[in-house]
């Protein structure tokens, strides 16, 4: 389902080599940061970034440059006690939060939010309160959709192909393909 998105993201230079395979496997926090950092750098070249916090950030369990860039820009947070947990897989609601924070860095991306979901997912009660406004935003922007059968699956694993497709949608407001369910 995601082949066109993967091809388009590759053509735009948004798919780092470490995530350019095993597309149906869950994505780790570190690998998601590699995608987010690619978008961040592309926007920086296009001069569309808002002024972002770029304070010094460090973690005891990683010194990966993409992780540190995303953390200093406010796209991702640590997990506590100075750790990032780079090898931990992310959930769909965590991805929504990270995508929203990344989108907020682009001065051309509309960033209005509220906690009320525009669509009532059958599993909406499972969406955590901290993720509601982020899921609302990514859904309304057409960046993330449900997983089929009127579900969002907030605690479900987020795959590499889903990550590539949604970071491409966020990056390119001229995205010509209709978003599909992230099966």
Model regions: which residues?
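Catalytic cores of secreted/periplasmic or lumenal enzymes
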Residues: 135
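Feature responds to low-complexity, polar/acidic, surface-exposed segments characteristic
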Residues: 1-3, 10-33, 37-66, 73-93, ...
């Amino acid at each position: 389902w995601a082949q066109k998105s993967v091809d388009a993201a590759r053509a735009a230079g948004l798919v780092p080599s470490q995530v350019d395979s095993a597309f149906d496997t869950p994505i780790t926090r570190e690998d998601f940061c590699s995608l987010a950092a690619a978008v961040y750098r592309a926007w920086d070249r296009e001069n569309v970034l808002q002024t972002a916090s770029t304070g010094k950030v460090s973690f005891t369990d990683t010194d990966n440059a993409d992780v540190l860039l995303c953390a200093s820009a406010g796209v991702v947070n640590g997990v506590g006690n100075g750790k990032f947990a780079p090898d931990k897989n992310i959930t769909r609601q965590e991805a929504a939060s990270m995508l929203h924070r990344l989108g907020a860095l682009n001065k051309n991306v509309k960033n209005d939010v509220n906690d009320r979901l525009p669509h009532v997912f059958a599993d909406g009660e499972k969406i955590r309160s901290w993720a509601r406004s982020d899921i609302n935003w990514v859904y309304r922007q057409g960046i993330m959709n449900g997983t089929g059968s009127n579900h969002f699956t907030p605690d479900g694993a987020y795959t590499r192909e889903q990550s590539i497709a949604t970071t491409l949608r966020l990056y390119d407001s001229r995205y010509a393909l209709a978003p599909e369910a992230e099966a």
